[in-house]
Each structure stands twice: as C-alpha cells, then as structure tokens.
Amino acid sequence: MKFGLYFCLALGAFTTVNAQETLTLSECLEMAVDNNLSLQRSRNEIVKGKISISENQAKLLPQVNAVAQINDNFAPPVSVTDGRAYGKAYNVTKTLQYNAAIGLQLQMPIYNQMARTAVEVSKIADRLNQLSYEKAREDIIMQTAQTYYMAQNTLEQIRLVNDNIKRLEELRNITQAFYDNQMSLEVDVKRVNFNIEDLTVQRDNALSMLQQQYTMLKFIIDYPAEKEIKVTDINPGQIDEVNACGLNTGLYELQLLDQKKVLAQKQTKLAKDAYLPTVSLTGNLMYSAYTDKFENWFRSGDSNHWYGSNGIGIQVRVPIFDGFGKRSKIEKAKAEEESARLGYEDAYKKLQANYMNAVSEVNNCQRNYKKQYDNYTLAQDVYNVTAYQYKEGVTSMTVVLQDEMRISEAMNNYLNAYYRYKVANLSLLKLTGQLEQLK
C-alpha cells in the first residue's frame, strides 16, 4: 500500500516537472512570428491589399450587364408629329399601355487615366501593407526578446537569492551552535533570521514577478495559458559582440516613410488626372415589345412581337467645371506630399541619433556589466573569507552580515547591468539590421 502511494506521488511529481517546457529564445521568436494574433491581423491586411488591386484593375476591363424592364403606363404618353401630310396641323399618336425591354449593355474603357493611376496607388498601398507587416514582425521580435531577457534576469535573481539564503542558513546554524555554547549572543541569531526572512520576501516577490513575465511571454507567442514554461539560464559574464556597422538605411520605418512619399506623389497625380477626359466604348443589344393588354404577351400573334435594336458607340467625358473641387484635392495632395517628405527626413535624422546613442550605450553597458559581475564575484569571495573567519572566531557577526549585504547589493547591480546590456544590444541589432541574428 505504501509502495503504491509513493509510486503515485513520484509519478505526479515527475509529470509536473515534465509539464514545464523550457523554451529557448529562438523557439519563442519563432512562435511569436507564427502565432501572434497581431501579426495575423497584419497578414490579413496584405490579403485585403491584393484584393484592392484586383478591384481597381477590374475598372479597366469591359463591363457587360443584362437588363430587363417592364412598364405599365396607366396614362400612356402621346407622340405629337407634323400632321400636314394627313391634312391637319398635328398628328397625335397615343402609345400602348404596356412595354417591355430586355438585352445586353456593354461599356469598356478606352482611355481612363484616373483608373490606371488608381491601380498604381493600390499597388503602392499593397507595398505599404507588406512593409507594415515586416515592421510589426520586427516589433514583436523586440517585445519577445525584451520579455524573455526580463524573465531570464528574474530567474537568475531567484537563483542568486536562494544561494544567499543557503549561505545565511549555514551561518545561522553556526551562530546557533555558538549561542548554545555561550559563544555568541541571542541577538546574533535574531539578526541572521531577520536577514533570511528579508531574502525570503525578496524571493517570493521575484517568483510572483517571474510568473507575470511568463504570462506576458505566453500571450506574445500565443502559447497555451494553462501550460507551464521556463526560460533558459543566463551565461554569467558572457559578452555578445555586436558589429556596429552603421545605421541600416533599409530599416522598415524608413521604407514605410519612403513608400508614403511615393504614395503622396501618386495621389497628387491622381488628383490631376481628374482634369483629363475619359473615352469609353459603348454598345447594346436590345429587344422591345409593346401591347395594349398584358395577357397578349402570353399569346401568339401580331400583338406579341419583339423588335430588335443594337448599336455601338464611343462616349467621351470631358470635365469642365466642378466648383474648384479638383483644385482643392490637388493642393491637399501636395501638402500631404510635403508632410511625407518632412516625416522621412525627421525619422532618418532621429534614427541616426538613436544609432549613435545606441553604440555609446552598448559600450557603456558592456563595461558596466563586466565590472558589476566582477564586483559580485569579488563580494562572494570576501564573504567566504569573512564567514570562515567567523567560524574560527576571528571576526564578529556584524562584519559577516555587512559582507552579506554587500553581496545582495552587488547582486542587484549585476542583474540590473545584465538587463540593460541585453536591451542595449537588442536596440543596436535592430538599428543595424542584424535583428535576425537573435538566438
């Protein structure tokens, strides 16, 4: 019975451990790009852009419509003609009460510059949709990486705090033994216990923060919320070199703004094209019938006769005056064109400044990270020496606790420097167009 109970408990523990999946940064980035709901919406916008191109191209193709019409003229109209051939001034002819028509109508653009420019505009808009998707994809990669680094940082904090707690627990055992042998004071035991409790609170807060970061990471990569995940451990002291090869002028922000300039130029052209004439080919193939009684259409005879008519022609439409509406559209389009140009220049100069600051920030954070890591390692060595001296009765509890506080302070500085360094590296990778190197 006991064996079965132990087996079930062991199996449950094994299942719980296995249920927690460790995800690398590369795996998270791949999931984010494939599954993120915001990116799926962006991909849907690309599909809509393709459809918009087809809609505008359809305006350049022939349009054929089938038409059918039937009229009941309660008061039939009359036709008045010259009646002198019949010996009277006017000849008045009354039309029949019912008439019907059925046939095909054709209209095909021969020259319509507005429609052609509209196709070009829709293609530019499609390109903007694609660039917007790439920009959104890049933003998701940045957000995923930052969240992943934050979780790694918190996980490392928990590991280091646990190490500190273990050290203090060993110190407490030694101090308790000293107290039992009247070699230390009760207040020394209380001091150690207080520090242990303080670190335990820090660890609990870090555990809560880690769960929140995991929840955010799962949301970004669209990972099942009910499943547990874990990030990989950091490599303490490792420096990732980034090639500061200059600002990448092909950044998606710049490409988007450049395409907006092109779009504004095309929209100006589209407004000007409204002054141009349009030429269309028209044609029809119709059949008409007339009767004085509706039921005659269901009988054979002279009263049920359909008359055919067909023709082909050219329709020319020349804009003359529209209340200065076209002129206002052209002025507005030119203003949009100038705004797009200024927006591009402003963004380019801002990104250049960001790049220079990013290079400086990476160099500074790299030095600071290495220094803080060395300080943390040194603080551990100093504490180990002090703790050994305390065991030998050479130094006091106060000195040991002071060195332990220095370890905690050095740990916090080291973790903050690590996160700042990783984020600075991430920004530089983005600005230099090397974001795909993330792994």
Where are these regions (language model features)?
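Bacterial Sec-dependent N-terminal signal peptides
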Residues: 1-29, 33-36, 436-439
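Acidic, low-complexity, intrinsically disordered peripheral segments
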Residues: 18, 225, 413-439
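Bacterial Sec-pathway N-terminal export signals of envelope proteins
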Residues: 19-65, 69, 75, 225, ...
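Sec/SRP-type N-terminal targeting helices
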Residues: 40-44, 57-58, 110-137, 187, ...
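Periplasmic alpha-helical coiled-coil/stalk elements that build and connect Gram-negative outer-membrane
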Residues: 51, 139-250, 361
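Outer-membrane beta-barrel architecture
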Residues: 54, 105, 267-270, 315
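Small/polar, glycine/serine/threonine/aspartate-rich low-complexity segments that form flexible
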Residues: 67-104, 237, 282-318
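Charged, solvent-exposed structural "stalk/scaffold" segments
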Residues: 150-205, 364-419, 427-431
